[in-house]
Amino acid sequence: MNNNFEKSILLMVPQWIQYHVSHRNETTFYVYPEYLKPFLYFLRDHMSTQYKVCIDITAADYPSRASRFECVYNLLSVEYNSRIRIKTCVDEITTLESVTPVYSSAAWWEREVWDMFGVFFHNHPDLRRILTDYGFQGHPLRKDFPLSGYVEVRYDDSEKRVCIESVEYSQEFRYFDFESPWEQVDKNSLLK
């Protein structure tokens, strides 16, 4: 993507963009969460952009940041044979406006981000789990989710039914912190 394109976008909507990064012909715009939807409308409808296809929406979890979830929107302009990445950051409480009115395919991607990370999309037409079970607790791609999960789901052949049991840990003398595995454990508390 050329430098003139980036400059023209920055001149047209400077208040919506936090900053942008260009690396190896890939452009990423970081936008404020409240301006995400208008910015995507702009990129879709403006004659010089024509990003009519939402290829993917995903997220990444950075627990050390105040706005720990980075939502990533990958867009394609068939008209100009160009791709662009839009990122916005939110915390656990802040909701994002659903972009399903802008891109209908976003409905599926937003459901996946909700299911895996717990990022809530306001005004989504059908925000429910898509990859995990209906009774599933938590969001498995968060960094504070335990690797083994909270329950074990298995089929018991002798009882001919699905059994849900609490996870049993086979290792002895190991400290499992269910509160926040990303905090440092005090060495003295392990010796007790």
Swiss-Prot record:
HAMAP family tied to this protein: NDH1_NuoC (MF_01357)
SUPFAM superfamilies named among the record's database cross-references: Nqo5-like
Subunit structure: Complex I is composed of about 30 different subunits.
Entry GO CC: mitochondrial inner membrane
An MF annotation (GO) of this entry: NADH dehydrogenase (ubiquinone) activity
Family from the record: Belongs to the complex I 30 kDa subunit family.
Catalytic activity, reaction form: a ubiquinone + NADH + 5 H(+)(in) = a ubiquinol + NAD(+) + 4 H(+)(out)
EC number of this enzyme: 7.1.1.2
Coiled coil: none
Pfam family, one: Complex1_30kDa
Keyword flag Ribosomal protein: no
PANTHER family for the chain: NADH DEHYDROGENASE [UBIQUINONE] IRON-SULFUR PROTEIN 3, MITOCHONDRIAL, NADH DEHYDROGENASE UBIQUINONE IRON-SULFUR PROTEIN 3
Function: Core subunit of the mitochondrial membrane respiratory chain NADH dehydrogenase (Complex I) that is believed to belong to the minimal assembly required for catalysis. Complex I functions in the transfer of electrons from NADH to the respiratory chain. The immediate electron acceptor for the enzyme is believed to be ubiquinone.
UniProt protein name: NADH-ubiquinone oxidoreductase subunit 9
Keyword vocabulary terms for this entry: Electron transport, Membrane, Mitochondrion, Mitochondrion inner membrane, NAD, Oxidoreductase, Respiratory chain, Translocase, Transport, Ubiquinone
Subcellular location, record wording: Mitochondrion inner membrane
